[in-house]
């Protein structure tokens, strides 16, 4: 699990759509005409945030695209079994290969947008970011490839991180800025000329993955089953909101428990980043379905009418597309 968690406030502390686990739909899906674009900083982010949601929508006929802003070139190797000289020497290539495997597992399309990983600076004071990295790009230069992709793919819904990046990685914060710029600019023919025909996405969501209500529910389910929980220390040390900063409200909970196993397969495809013995997999999928069978989001922008809370990222959009 990441070092820091999303700052969110659940609507009532439990998923809106808890109850019997849903089943994965059988057979090939019928095309819906709906399109979803998830905007991420690095390969592996797509598998740790919103992966089960994407798998569910793909298998219900939605076209799903992942935009990956960087290649993860400066990432650490977090799986000891992969800590080998030849892996370190070829990390950019290997991370692309891992992304290809995860893409196939999830069933999504995927596009690298060509920027260089900034790395996660450590120290006090923090060292300067490396020249040429994504986080130091001018906003217009960083946003242009995403604007072009939005105009090409023409998504109805965008997913990305909140203004704090979900956790304080400079590439995640920059990804938020770039996604906001693309959402606001892609429909304006006077902005980013030469980057395709204008297109306006209708909804923008922030991931709300690692929030206290969910982690507490997973912890309690493991304890109830007599299993060891890796979350006790995390919860004990949980830092509440800084004074003056409003928690991110959960507005939308997508039931996708039947796809948690697919999410986990996609995570494992990122072998340099995910240790199969790590706390990522401490809570079995069936326990997760029982405790918290949704993936959660905050609706940040909407150009369509929708009633909150939602259980569908396309609420308010399906009717338009089906006409």
What are these regions (language model features)?
Residues 137, 167-188:
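A mobile, often basic/glycine-rich helix-loop segment
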Residues 46, 73-76, 163-170, 212-214:
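Active-site environment of divalent metal-dependent phosphoester hydrolases
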Residues 113-116, 160-164, 170, 206-209:
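Short, well-ordered beta-to-alpha junction loops that form the rim of enzyme active sites
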Residues 1-32, 188-323:
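C-terminal accessory domains and tails appended to enzymatic cores
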Residues 81-84, 175, 219-223:
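Short secondary-structure boundary/capping segments
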Residues 142, 146-164, 172-175:
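Proline-aspartate-enriched helix->loop->beta-strand connector
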Residues 2-153, 181, 298-299, 306-309:
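Active-site rim/loop-helix segments in enzyme catalytic domains that contact anionic ligands
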Residues 64, 156, 199-203:
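Residue-level recognition of the N-termini of beta-strands and the immediately preceding loop/turn
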């Amino acid at each position: 699990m990441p070092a820091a968690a999303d700052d969110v406030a659940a609507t009532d502390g439990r998923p809106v759509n808890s109850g019997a686990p849903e089943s994965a739909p059988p057979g090939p899906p019928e095309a819906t005409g709906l399109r979803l674009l998830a905007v991420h900083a690095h390969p592996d982010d797509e598998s740790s945030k919103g992966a089960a949601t994407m798998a569910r929508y793909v298998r219900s006929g939605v076209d799903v695209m992942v935009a990956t802003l960087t290649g993860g070139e400066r990432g650490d190797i977090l799986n000891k079994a992969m800590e080998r000289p030849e892996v370190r020497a070829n990390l950019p290539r290997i991370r692309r290969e891992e992304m290809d495997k995860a893409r196939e597992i999830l069933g999504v399309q995927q596009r690298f947008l060509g920027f260089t990983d900034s790395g996660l600076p450590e120290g006090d004071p923090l060292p300067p970011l490396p020249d040429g990295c994504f986080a130091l790009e001018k906003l217009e230069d960083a946003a242009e490839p995403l604007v072009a992709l939005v105009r090409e793919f023409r998504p109805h819904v965008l997913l990305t991180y909140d203004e704090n990046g979900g956790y304080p990685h400079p590439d995640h914060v920059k990804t938020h800025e770039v996604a906001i710029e693309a959402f606001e600019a892609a429909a304006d023919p006077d902005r980013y000329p030469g980057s395709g025909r204008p297109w306006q996405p209708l909804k923008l969501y922030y991931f709300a993955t690692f929030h206290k209500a969910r982690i507490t529910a997973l912890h309690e389910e493991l304890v109830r089953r007599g299993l060891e929980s890796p979350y006790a220390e995390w919860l004990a040390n949980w830092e509440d909101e800084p004074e003056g900063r409003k928690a991110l409200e959960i507005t939308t909970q997508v039931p996708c428990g039947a796809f948690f196993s697919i999410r986990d397969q996609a995570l494992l495809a990122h072998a340099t980043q995910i240790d199969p013995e790590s706390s990522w997999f401490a809570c079995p999928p069936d326990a997760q379905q029982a405790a918290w069978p949704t993936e959660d989001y905050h609706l940040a922008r909407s150009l369509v009418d929708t009633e909150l809370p939602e259980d569908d990222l396309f609420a308010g959009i399906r009717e338009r597309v089906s006409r």
